[in-house]
UniProtKB/Swiss-Prot annotation:
Residues 112-183 form the S4 RNA-binding domain. GO terms for molecular function: rRNA binding; structural constituent of ribosome. Involved in nucleolar processing of pre-18S ribosomal RNA and ribosome assembly. One of its GO terms (cellular component) is nucleolus. Belongs to the universal ribosomal protein uS4 family. It comes from Encephalitozoon cuniculi (strain GB-M1). Component of the small ribosomal subunit. This is Small ribosomal subunit protein uS4. Keywords: Cytoplasm, Nucleus, Ribonucleoprotein, Ribosomal protein, Ribosome biogenesis, RNA-binding, rRNA processing, rRNA-binding.
Length: 184
């Protein structure tokens, strides 16, 4: 029995040949080392949903919406390190935080991908090299191998990004390779 059909992860642009958008997308794909524009469109959909949610909350007439739903949105963005330094107990700071969400750009979201975090941590020479390391299962987050370049890294897990200990870059993998050379 087949399962339910999931919702689309990405939405395609309305005008496929808009020159400014094509140039901007090509630059983002190159800077962040994305495989194709579909990966960019997935992140843009997440970004647009968060922005729309913040806009709806700010214009809501129900006074209970901002404290409850606004805090949950801001808590999630703070968890991923997209926003920071917001006191969720103060209602005015929550409103200010929702205004900050409207000021975010797609770059804030793309920088939280594992591929860019590996490059930013200095484990790879470029974002393209980072993608190869991740696909080759050479990167782990706290002893958990992650082989998805689009994995969104939480702010508390960022310092735990390291080489997989059993890969050729990790400590145990290097010892294993040295033992093989010694046997020959």
């Amino acid at each position: 029995m087949a399962g339910k059909k999931g919702s689309k992860r990405a939405s395609t642009p309305r005008d496929p040949f808009e020159k400014e958008r094509l140039i901007r997308e090509a630059q983002l794909v190159g800077v962040y080392g994305l495989k194709n524009k579909h990966e960019l469109w997935v992140m843009e959909k997440i970004f647009a949903k968060d922005k729309e949610r913040a806009r709806i909350l700010l214009t809501s007439t129900n006074p209970e919406d901002i404290p409850i739903n606004g805090r949950s949105l801001l808590r999630r963005l703070m968890k991923y390190g997209i926003l920071g330094g917001i006191d969720l107990c103060d209602k005015q700071e929550v409103v200010n935080g929702l205004n900050k969400v409207l000021d975010l750009t797609i770059n804030h979201y793309l920088e939280r991908r594992l591929q860019f975090r590996v490059f930013a941590a200095g484990l790879a020479k470029s974002v393209h090299h980072a993608r190869l390391l991740i696909g080759g299962r050479c990167i782990s987050i706290k002893d958990q191998i992650v082989d998805v370049p689009g994995f969104m890294v939480r702010a508390d897990k960022e310092p735990l990004i390291e080489y997989n200990p059993y890969s050729r870059y990790g400590d145990k993998g290097k010892k294993k390779a040295e033992a093989k050379v010694g046997e020959e």
